[in-house]
Every structure is written in structure tokens, then in C-alpha cells.
From Swiss-Prot:
Catalyzes the conversion of dethiobiotin (DTB) to biotin by the insertion of a sulfur atom into dethiobiotin via a radical-based mechanism. Residues 39-266 form the Radical SAM core domain. GO terms for molecular function: 2 iron, 2 sulfur cluster binding; 4 iron, 4 sulfur cluster binding; biotin synthase activity; iron ion binding. This is Biotin synthase. Homodimer. Belongs to the radical SAM superfamily. Biotin synthase family. It holds the Pfam family Radical_SAM. The gene is bioB. [4Fe-4S] cluster binds at C54, C58, C61. Gene3D superfamilies: Aldolase class I (3.20.20.70).
Length: 315
């Protein structure tokens, strides 16, 4: 079942997710080959442009002001600083430059500066993405005017489990922002995190929510939790690699046209596990040594692995 614009049911997705592993991989990889070059990856870079002191209480996040973590508060970077980082990202092979700020929602006074960042990064020939928290319709329109290509706003987990992870906002708040972004004509980047203490049923409901959006996200980041000392989820049980691959494969089947990004947690993955993820349908990664505040595989390690697998940069 890979029909586009299909409204999926929980039982549909359970049947896909829980089928024998080899059958799941075969189905996912067949669909992946139909819609994408199986030997190419999209390279993106993620920069924290405003770090720490976020008023939200996401139980996994190093940047929450509710917890004492290794992260130090840093003010919003200047346009010049951001553009220098964007130039370095382009030189390192990135095609998309993502800018993240630890806000509940961006202050209106910051919008002109954010628009300058977007315009400057686009002038370098890079695609632009931002993740700034919740957006109003007006703010989304301003970012679109500046030329923003993608906006990231993850739903994190299933609607049923969401309030076990975050209490300072509602799941519906996430959907409202996604609707504002979509209405403004900006492409949607939306995914979640595995390893928050959720069940397999939660992961299936999470995928159902994404796949049944009126227009599924153009980009779907799948993160494996990086436990952060000082946060409530610091001791969360690690999701097994096979479960990660099942989630990616199912996402590929449900959302055949979307880019599936293997995001946080790659530093803890073996080459073999990453290879399975790419075979299952992941076709986008963040390159560079940092993902906001956490470590990412060093460039030379990525280059070595991608060469072994015959994976090249997406045109």
C-alpha cells in the first residue's frame, strides 16, 4: 500500500510496521527506488542561531530553561555571523542551511533580522530552513516573503504520549503552527524523536499523524534520542536499532515522496545500522560536527562511510 493521498488507519500501519523485517525492507526499498535515487543523499547543515533559556519544558531538550544542562545561554547571532557559518557549510558540501532558535515563539522584533538571514543565505545559493518555535500566520507570511524554503516544527511523538514529554504546550499548538506554515506557502519539515519512553503503538500513531496530514511533510526528520544529563529523559531506555529501521521503512512506505532525514543519534550508530537506515529509505542527513548543541559525526567519518556505501551527494 503506497497510494498517494491515502488516509491511513492504525490497522493499516500496524500491518506494515509489524510485518517480517525482510518483507518490510523489501517493500520500503522498492518504493524508495521508485521515487528517489537510492544512492544519493541530501546534505544539510544545522546551526543554533540563539541558544538556551527556552521557556518550554520538553523533557529531552538540553536548551530548556527548566533544567540544568551543559548548555550556556547565547543571544541571537548577528546576520554576519550566520552568513559566515552558511558559507562554511556550503564549502563543506551542504545544499540546505537550517537555522534553529530556542524560543517558544520568535519575538516580533526579531523578524526583520531573521528575514535578513534568510535572504543572505539564499544569496549564497543554499536552500533555507528555520526552526524557531510556534509561528503566527503573520510571522509565517513574513518569513515566506524573505524566501524561506522550509520550516521545521516537529510533532515529536504521538498525540497520545505528547503530554508525557511536554507540558508547556499542547499537541494542537504544533498542528496550528504547521497549518500556518503550510498556508503561507512554505514547505514543511516535520518529524519526531524515538526513545522518549514511547511504545511501538505510539510510534505507529506518530507516523499515522504525519502521513494523514492533508499534504504530508516534504521532509521528515527521524531522531534517535541523545540523552542529555540534567533532563528528565537522561536515563531513557535506548530504542533498538531494528525498531529505528522499522520506523524509517514504514515512513518511506507511507510518505513515498518525502525526504526522510536520519537526524540526531548517528554518532551512536554503527556503520551497519546506518546502512540499513539508508536502504530502508532515509535519504537525507545533517553534516557538520554539531546538531544545535549536540555532537554529530565528524565530516571525515561521514565521507568514509558514504564512500564505502557508494552514496553520493544529491544533485
Amino acid at each position: 500500500m503506497s497510494e498517494e493521498n491515502k488516509q491511513w488507519s492504525i490497522s493499516d500501519i500496524e500491518a506494515i510496521y509489524q510485518q517480517p523485517f525482510n518483507d518490510l525492507l523489501y517493500q520500503a526499498h522498492t518504493i524508495h527506488r521508485t521515487y528517489h535515487d537510492p544512492n544519493s543523499l541530501q546534505f544539510a547543515t544545522l546551526l543554533s542561531i540563539k541558544t538556551g533559556a527556552c521557556p518550554e519544558d520538553c523533557g529531552y531538550c538540553s536548551q530548556s530553561g527548566h533544567y540544568k544542562t551543559h548548555v550556556e545561554k547565547e543571544k541571537l547571532m548577528s546576520v554576519e555571523e550566520v552568513l559566515q557559518c552558511a558559507k562554511e557549510a556550503k564549502e563543506g558540501g551542504a545544499k540546505r542551511f537550517c537555522m534553529g532558535a530556542a524560543w517558544r515563539c520568535p519575538p516580533d522584533k526579531a523578524i526583520p533580522q531573521l528575514k535578513e538571514m534568510i535572504e543572505g543565505v539564499k544569496s549564497l545559493g543554499l536552500e533555507t530552513c528555520m526552526t524557531l518555535g510556534m509561528l503566527t500566520k503573520e510571522q509565517a507570511s513574513h518569513l515566506k516573503e524573505a524566501g524561506l524554503d522550509y520550516y521545521n516544527h516537529n510533532i515529536d511523538t504521538s498525540p497520545s504520549y505528547y503530554d508525557k514529554v511536554v507540558t508547556t504546550r499542547k499537541f494542537s499548538d504544533r498542528l496550528d503552527t504547521l497549518n500556518n506554515v503550510r498556508s503561507a506557502g512554505i514547505n514543511v519539515c516535520c518529524g519526531g524523536i524515538l526513545g522518549l519512553g514511547e511504545t511501538r503503538e505510539d510510534r505507529i500513531e506518530f507516523l499515522l499523524t504525519l502521513a494523514n496530514m492533508e499534504t504530508p511533510p516534504e521532509s521528515v526528520p527521524i531522531n534517535r534520542l541523545i540523552p542529555v544529563e540534567g533532563t528528565p529523559l537522561a536515563q531513557a531506555e535506548r530504542v533498538e536499532g531494528i525498531e529505528l529501521v522499522r520506523t524509517i521503512a514504514t515512513a518511506r512506505i507511507l510518505m513515498p515522496k518525502s525526504a526522510i532525514r536520519l537526524t540526531a543519534g548517528r554518532t551512536e550508530m554503527s556503520d551497519e545500522l546506518q546502512a540499513l537506515c539508508y536502504f530502508a529509505g532515509a535519504n537525507s542527513v545533517f553534516i557538520g560536527d554539531k546538531l544545535l548543541t549536540e555532537d554529530n559525526p565528524q565530516r571525515f567519518k561521514d565521507k568514509t562511510l558514504f564512500n564505502k556505501l557508494g552514496l553520493t551527494e544529491m544533485a
